[in-house]
């Protein structure tokens, strides 16, 4: 039976979470060579590589399994410290590393978890990923939980439907007047600038496809949820924006719908480790109770 040295596993987790050996060393209060040595010792112990040494480093299949183990051990240790307070020498708040999409972070997330974090003295380490790809962080064992658009959980985890984020195709009045003086035509949307969050953002593609428009389209790239709204309101392009995020802009007429009533509802799921302990289970209950206040209720 292998008994792991958790200092070695902590080094692996730090390298992956911090995106490199130098930052991992700073986070752990060690030299970079010491972190590298711990990774080498871990690889010698398990008999195979645990990291692919690229920029940034990422875990091998075995490395992902070890990171999954680390995440669950951290959560279970937190449970034990609550039952045996003397084990928690520093009395420091617990930290949860969570992956979620930028639009959730910009809209409903803070209201949904604020009370929980204050009452339970929890610090969040948030990793922003598009809702289409956030689950890769769970699969890699980098996070304790994840909000994403996929219903299927990774091995060892569960998923629960939180609700749906409602998106509307919007643009500024000036943009519409400039490009569509006789009214918005679906077929012409591909020929005017759109705004896309990043290469994994397929909402604009889906919007056009729902309208029967196939093929590519010209677009700006803007990897910021708040910046996306500002660019849209500034007349640089059209885009799919969370309805909840722009209620003020819609009320003031700074943004208008391209095609009124044409919406896309994106289901969002909460993924969490089955053996994640009481803290993660409590957060899950809290999210199920509160997330619906900021999302559209859907069956599922």
Curated annotation (Swiss-Prot):
DNA-binding region in chain numbering: 21-40
Keywords, ordered alphabetically: DNA-binding, Transcription, Transcription regulation
Domain of life from the UniProt record: Bacteria
PROSITE patterns (alphabetical): HTH_LYSR (PS50931)
InterPro entries: ArgP, ArgP_gammaproteobact, LTTR, LysR_subst-bd, Tscrpt_reg_HTH_LysR, WH-like_DNA-bd_sf, WH_DNA-bd_sf
Domain HTH lysR-type positions: 4-60
UniProt record, GO biological process: regulation of DNA-templated transcription
GO MF, one annotated term: sequence-specific DNA binding
Disulfide bonds: none
Functional description taken from the UniProt entry: Controls the transcription of genes involved in arginine and lysine metabolism.
Record text on subunit structure and interactions: Homodimer.
Similarity remark: Belongs to the LysR transcriptional regulatory family.
Official protein name in the record: HTH-type transcriptional regulator ArgP
Organism: Pseudomonas aeruginosa (strain ATCC 15692 / DSM 22644 / CIP 104116 / JCM 14847 / LMG 12228 / 1C / PRS 101 / PAO1)
Lineage: Bacteria, Pseudomonadati, Pseudomonadota, Gammaproteobacteria, Pseudomonadales
Gene name tied to this protein: argP
């Amino acid at each position: 039976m292998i008994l792991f040295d958790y200092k070695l596993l902590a080094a692996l987790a730090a390298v992956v979470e911090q995106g490199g050996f130098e930052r991992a060393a700073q986070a752990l209060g060690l030299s970079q060579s010491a972190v590298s040595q711990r990774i080498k010792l871990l690889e010698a112990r398990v008999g195979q590589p645990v990291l692919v040494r690229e920029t940034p480093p990422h875990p091998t299949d075995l490395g992902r399994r070890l990171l999954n183990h680390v995440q669950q051990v951290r959560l279970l240790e937190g449970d034990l410290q609550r039952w045996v307070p003397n084990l928690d020498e520093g009395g420091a708040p617990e930290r949860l590393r969570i992956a979620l999409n930028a639009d959730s972070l910009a809209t409903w997330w803070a209201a949904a978890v604020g009370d929980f974090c204050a009452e339970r003295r929890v610090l969040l380490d948030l990793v922003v990923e598009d809702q289409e790809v956030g689950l890769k962080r769970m699969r890699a064992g980098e996070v304790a939980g994840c909000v994403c658009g996929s219903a299927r959980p990774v091995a060892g985890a569960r998923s629960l439907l939180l609700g749906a984020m409602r998106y509307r195709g919007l643009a500024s009045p000036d943009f519409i007047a400039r490009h569509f003086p006789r009214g918005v035509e679906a077929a012409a949307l591909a020929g005017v600038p759109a705004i896309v969050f990043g290469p994994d953002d397929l909402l604009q593609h889906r919007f056009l496809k729902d309208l029967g428009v196939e093929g590519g389209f010209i677009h700006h790239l803007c990897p910021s949820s708040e910046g996306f709204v500002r660019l849209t309101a500034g007349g640089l392009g059209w885009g799919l924006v969370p309805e909840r995020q722009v209620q003020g802009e819609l009320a003031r007429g700074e943004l208008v719908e391209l095609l009124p009533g044409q919406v896309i509802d994106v289901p969002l799921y909460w993924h969490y480790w089955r053996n994640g302990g009481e803290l993660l289970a409590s957060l899950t209950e809290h999210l199920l109770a509160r997330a619906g206040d900021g999302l559209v209720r859907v069956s599922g």
